[in-house]
Design a protein with these regions (language model features):
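Active-site metal-binding loops of divalent metal-dependent hydrolases
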Residues: 1, 18-19, 44, 117-118, ...
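Conserved beta-strand hairpin/beta-sheet module of binuclear metal-dependent hydrolase folds
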Residues: 1-6, 104-107, 111-117
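Active-site metal-binding motif and surrounding structural segment of the metallo-beta-lactamase
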Residues: 1-39
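Structural recognition of the beta-strand scaffold that forms the well-ordered cores
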Residues: 12-16, 38-42, 91, 104, ...
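Extracytoplasmic/secreted cell-surface and envelope-processing proteins
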Residues: 22-25, 48-50, 123-124, 163-166
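Metallo-beta-lactamase
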Residues: 47-101, 109, 147-150
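Divalent-metal (often Zn2+) His-rich catalytic cores of metallo-beta-lactamase-fold enzymes
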Residues: 106, 112, 137-166
Length: 166
């Protein structure tokens, strides 16, 4: 947020790429800072957020205290599968199939994958949400899809501080 404010540019879109609360709880704060910005996600991510938001807020609020969302935002469903930032195309991929609720963004001009929860950087992978063999196979297939892009930069959905993103 500080980089956007310092740039003097107008933030138009806040994209939520996953239905886990660590991906959307902060949207409330960003929306307060950038009230003109639209908070968007895919249909599958919104469906998961909508189904679980009340329970996630009830569980996490006591643990987060003053940092818990007061009015969590349910993102709007984006139209299409692309966004633009400063004229650069950003593709939202992985929006169909078993992992439609775990999309990723691909920036073709710089060959970058950004923010996919399937990718962990220097952390043990979280497997509690993929316990069935079919879910693990879908995860492996998505990783194969990501690898086939031959990205020059990969920003994991979760990473330890200092993780190299190249």
């Amino acid at each position: 947020a500080a980089n956007v404010l310092d740039s003097g540019k107008t933030l138009k879109t806040i994209f939520i790429s996953n239905a886990d609360p660590d991906f959307y709880f902060g949207a409330e704060v960003l929306k307060e800072m950038f009230p003109q910005a639209h908070v968007l996600t895919t249909a599958a991510v919104r469906e998961k957020i909508e189904a679980k938001m009340a329970g996630k807020v009830a569980f996490w609020s006591p643990k987060m205290g003053a940092n818990a969302p007061r009015h969590p935002i349910l993102p709007e469903v984006m139209k299409g599968n692309t966004l633009t930032v400063d004229g650069e195309l950003i593709e939202v991929r992985g929006t169909t199939g078993a992992l439609a609720h775990r999309p990723y963004t691909w920036i073709p001009s710089i060959k970058a994958i950004v923010g996919n929860i399937a990718i962990f950087g220097n952390l043990h992978v979280w497997t509690a949400d993929t316990q069935k063999p079919s879910e693990r196979q879908a995860w492996f297939a998505q990783l194969d899809e990501l690898e086939a892009l031959q990205a020059k930069t990969v920003v994991p959905g979760h990473m330890a501080a200092g993780t190299d993103r190249k």
